């Protein structure tokens, strides 16, 4: 075969066992529904060991796109770090040992900051517990936790239980909770520096609502309809109303998020550069991150560096002299480029990139179509030119609107995607492209929890794969790692040996 291929990723578009709670099943999406009737389809697993995550763990976009491009199961930091915590080998990691040594010799406090969540998407509470144990065993007396509440990868009101568990865990240890803030502020990834500033001012200047009881403060927030993701800065204080701890020059900071994208902006403000407009000045810190947030950072120590993934689909296409396009809106642009290329930033030879800005709205339920129409308009002329041999396209709507937990908005998102899919596939068929329609993980097919509350998290449901081709009549079930071998099979290119997964044709 020598086909041109479009990989169309409907982000967050899973297969629900219960149509009642599914935005997809409740949406009017005649074109996507017709694809199942007219073309071969099967399903893919995107969770747990199928994508190199711990068993039972829901997939996410970063992991999903990495497996898609790699053509193999990529064992994720989460699985690696979990093992280190279980086997109590975390304290043997060089970067961590050296940070503890520095704190001890210079009598400096250690500030652990990160997402306090069992979601396992950006972080995991077990990793924080492992780090706290390691610090205590090292004999460190001044350890502080700056917790970012989740409510997005887990339920919107789960922070109270998570903080209660943390308080029990650190009772009778030297560790103390120093501050609390929602991830909406501390973990922005869209250059909304005014959000990061709230987190910076809390951590560095102790600016926040004073509290001696974080659980009480959070339940007050709930009464004002502010859920975990949006918790406003809370500074924990002692009996004299002084902050328990703020981050000072020469302190040790350990950022325990293992996923890289949402740790970058706060790290930049604390350690890399001054933001004069926001009055944020970098501090001279002993700064450690659990994984490598950015190769270009100066003076940031990394506990777990990434294994380089080579011979990804992009690289194989480059070697075969093929032209490829990666296209997405801002929210998923790193996924179709950096993650799909196995953690490589620069484009391959013959790779062009099309980025459309995601709309500047507070939350995407306010504009559920996001930038899907703009992406479609930009892509159609490229399909008509037929110069590209491979196109990787991501529609973000199912995931990003799914995260809001608002069913009516998610239905609108699905309907917008349906219109765009119709335009792209119509053009693809007219110009002899084969389109593989898949998702990277589930989300908008489960908008409501069994107890009736909104579900904002990803799911472990399987996702569809539809093979839109004029001749081929079968496609098999598989995992995300099978997609690159399938694409190479369609294009008539031999897959490299390191691509250990299989074509689904």
Swiss-Prot record:
Active-site positions on this chain = 61
One biological process term in Gene Ontology = glucose catabolic process
Could you tell me what the cofactor note in this record states?
Binds 2 manganese ions per subunit.
User: Source organism's superkingdom?
Assistant: Bacteria
EC? 5.4.2.12
Q: Which GO terms describe its cellular component?
A: cytosol
The entry's Mn(2+) 1-binding residues are 399, 403, 458
Instruction: Cite the NCBIfam families for this sequence.
Output: pgm_bpd_ind
Family in the record: Belongs to the BPG-independent phosphoglycerate mutase family.
Q: What is the name attached to this protein's record?
A: 2,3-bisphosphoglycerate-independent phosphoglycerate mutase
State the organism of origin: Flavobacterium psychrophilum (strain ATCC 49511 / DSM 21280 / CIP 103535 / JIP02/86)
Tell me the name of the encoding gene: gpmI
């Amino acid at each position: 075969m020598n086909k041109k291929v479009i990989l169309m990723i409907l982000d967050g578009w899973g297969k629900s066992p219960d149509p009642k709670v599914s935005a997809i099943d409740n949406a009017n999406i005649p074109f996507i529904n017709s694809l199942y009737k007219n073309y071969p389809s099967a399903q893919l697993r995107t969770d747990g060991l199928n994508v190199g995550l711990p068993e039972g763990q829901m997939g996410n976009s970063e992991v999903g796109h990495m497996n898609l491009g790699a053509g193999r199961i990529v064992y994720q930091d989460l699985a690696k770090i979990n093992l280190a915590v279980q086997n109590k080998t975390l304290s043997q990691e060089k970067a961590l040992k050296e940070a503890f040594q520095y704190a001890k010799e210079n009598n400096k406090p250690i500030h652990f900051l990160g997402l306090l969540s069992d979601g396992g998407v950006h972080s995991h509470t077990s990793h924080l517990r492992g780090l706290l144990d390691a610090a205590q065993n090292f004999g460190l007396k001044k350890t502080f936790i700056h917790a970012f509440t989740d409510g997005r990868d887990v339920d919107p009101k789960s922070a109270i239980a998570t903080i209660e568990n943390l308080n029990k865990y650190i009772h009778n240890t030297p560790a103390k909770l120093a501050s609390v803030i929602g991830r909406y502020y501390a973990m922005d990834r869209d250059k909304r520096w005014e959000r990061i500033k709230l987190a910076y001012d809390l951590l560095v200047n102790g600016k926040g609502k004073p509290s001696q009881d974080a659980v009480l403060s959070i339940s007050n927030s709930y009464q004002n309809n502010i859920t975990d993701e949006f918790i406003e800065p809370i500074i924990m204080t002692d009996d004299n109303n002084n902050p328990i701890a703020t981050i000072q020059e020469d302190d040790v900071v350990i950022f325990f998020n293992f996923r890289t994208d949402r740790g970058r902006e706060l790290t930049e403000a604390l350690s890399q550069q001054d933001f004069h407009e926001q009055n944020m000045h970098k501090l001279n810190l002993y700064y450690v991150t659990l994984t490598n947030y950015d190769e270009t950072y100066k003076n940031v120590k990394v506990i777990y560096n990434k294994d380089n993934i080579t011979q990804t689909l992009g690289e194989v296409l480059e070697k075969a002299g093929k032209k490829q396009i990666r296209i997405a809106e801002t929210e998923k642009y790193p996924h179709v480029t950096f993650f799909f290329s196995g953690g490589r930033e620069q484009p391959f030879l013959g790779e062009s990139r099309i980025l459309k800005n995601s709309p500047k709205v507070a939350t995407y339920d306010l504009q559920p179509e996001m930038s899907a129409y703009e992406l479609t308009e930009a892509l159609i002329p490229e399909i008509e030119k037929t110069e590209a041999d491979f196109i990787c396209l991501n529609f973000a709507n199912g995931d990003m609107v799914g995260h809001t937990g608002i069913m009516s908005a998610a239905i609108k998102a699905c309907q917008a995607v349906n219109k765009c899919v119709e335009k792209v596939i119509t053009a693809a068929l007219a110009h002899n492209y084969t389109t593989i329609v898949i998702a990277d993980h589930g989300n908008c097919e489960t908008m409501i929890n069994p107890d009736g509350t909104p579900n904002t998290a990803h799911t472990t449901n399987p996702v569809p794969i539809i093979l839109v081709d004029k001749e081929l009549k079968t496609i098999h079930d598989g995992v995300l790692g099978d997609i690159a071998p399938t694409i190479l099979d369609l294009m008539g290119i031999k897959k490299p040996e390191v691509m250990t997964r299989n074509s689904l044709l």
